[in-house]
């Protein structure tokens, strides 16, 4: 049998997932239970869209809970003190010059379980994150992206 996938995460990422899991188990489950009770009060379940919706919401939430529990159970937390100061790694904040847009951008390199590109948290498994990991200040990387090749120069590296 194969080993379960391990999720490299920062301490901050673990705390965020734990908070989301707690919310789903306490608040969201109660809300759904209440919706189901109300829907059952409407009688005939064969054409009760409120009941169907609540049951679908329940199934989605329970699936999300299992997913979060699995990620947390298989999390490998990056020790902040072991994050190198001069090499990009998970837990680093890296400032790069994006040559496509001629601008400076700061990314946090995180594990795939906590990636959020809209917040500039990119996974070490993403094309850009993977290209940056292991590099130093002054290095220039070229990354194959869906619309061609992007070029980045590493300007600064900090611990997350």
UniProtKB/Swiss-Prot annotation:
<dbReference type="Pfam" id="PF01272">
    <property type="entry name" value="GreA_GreB"/>
</dbReference>
<dbReference type="InterPro" id="IPR028624">
    <property type="entry name" value="Tscrpt_elong_fac_GreA/B"/>
</dbReference>
<dbReference type="InterPro" id="IPR036805">
    <property type="entry name" value="Tscrpt_elong_fac_GreA/B_N_sf"/>
</dbReference>
<dbReference type="GO" id="GO:0003677">
    <property type="term" value="F:DNA binding"/>
</dbReference>
<feature type="coiled-coil region">
    <location>
        <begin position="49"/>
        <end position="75"/>
    </location>
</feature>
<keyword id="KW-0805">Transcription regulation</keyword>
<dbReference type="InterPro" id="IPR023459">
    <property type="entry name" value="Tscrpt_elong_fac_GreA/B_fam"/>
</dbReference>
<dbReference type="InterPro" id="IPR018151">
    <property type="entry name" value="TF_GreA/GreB_CS"/>
</dbReference>
<comment type="similarity">
    <text>Belongs to the GreA/GreB family.</text>
</comment>
<keyword id="KW-0238">DNA-binding</keyword>
<dbReference type="GO" id="GO:0070063">
    <property type="term" value="F:RNA polymerase binding"/>
</dbReference>
<dbReference type="InterPro" id="IPR006359">
    <property type="entry name" value="Tscrpt_elong_fac_GreA"/>
</dbReference>
<keyword id="KW-0175">Coiled coil</keyword>
<protein>
    <recommendedName>
        <fullName>Transcription elongation factor GreA</fullName>
    </recommendedName>
</protein>
<keyword id="KW-0804">Transcription</keyword>
<dbReference type="InterPro" id="IPR036953">
    <property type="entry name" value="GreA/GreB_C_sf"/>
</dbReference>
<dbReference type="GO" id="GO:0032784">
    <property type="term" value="P:regulation of DNA-templated transcription elongation"/>
</dbReference>
<comment type="function">
    <text>Necessary for efficient RNA polymerase transcription elongation past template-encoded arresting sites. The arresting sites in DNA have the property of trapping a certain fraction of elongating RNA polymerases that pass through, resulting in locked ternary complexes. Cleavage of the nascent transcript by cleavage factors such as GreA or GreB allows the resumption of elongation from the new 3'terminus. GreA releases sequences of 2 to 3 nucleotides.</text>
</comment>
<dbReference type="Pfam" id="PF03449">
    <property type="entry name" value="GreA_GreB_N"/>
</dbReference>
<dbReference type="InterPro" id="IPR001437">
    <property type="entry name" value="Tscrpt_elong_fac_GreA/B_C"/>
</dbReference>
<dbReference type="InterPro" id="IPR022691">
    <property type="entry name" value="Tscrpt_elong_fac_GreA/B_N"/>
</dbReference>
<dbReference type="GO" id="GO:0006354">
    <property type="term" value="P:DNA-templated transcription elongation"/>
</dbReference>
């Amino acid at each position: 049998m194969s080993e379960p996938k391990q999720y490299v995460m920062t301490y901050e990422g673990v705390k965020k997932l734990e908070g989301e899991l707690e919310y789903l188990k306490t608040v969201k489950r109660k809300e759904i239970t209440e919706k189901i009770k109300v829907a059952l009060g409407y009688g005939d379940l064969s054409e009760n869209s409120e009941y169907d919706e609540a049951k679908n919401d329940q199934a989605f939430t329970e699936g999300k809970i299992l997913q979060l529990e699995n990620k947390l159970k298989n999390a490998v937390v990056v020790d902040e003190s072991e994050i190198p100061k001069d090499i990009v790694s998970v837990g680093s904040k890296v400032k790069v010059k994006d040559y496509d847009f001629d601008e400076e951008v700061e990314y946090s390199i995180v594990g795939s379980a906590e990636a959020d590109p809209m917040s500039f948290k990119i996974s070490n498994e993403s094309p850009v994150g993977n290209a940056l990991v292991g590099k130093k200040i002054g290095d220039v990387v070229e990354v194959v992206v869906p619309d061609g090749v992007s070029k980045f120069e590493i300007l600064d590296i900090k611990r997350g």
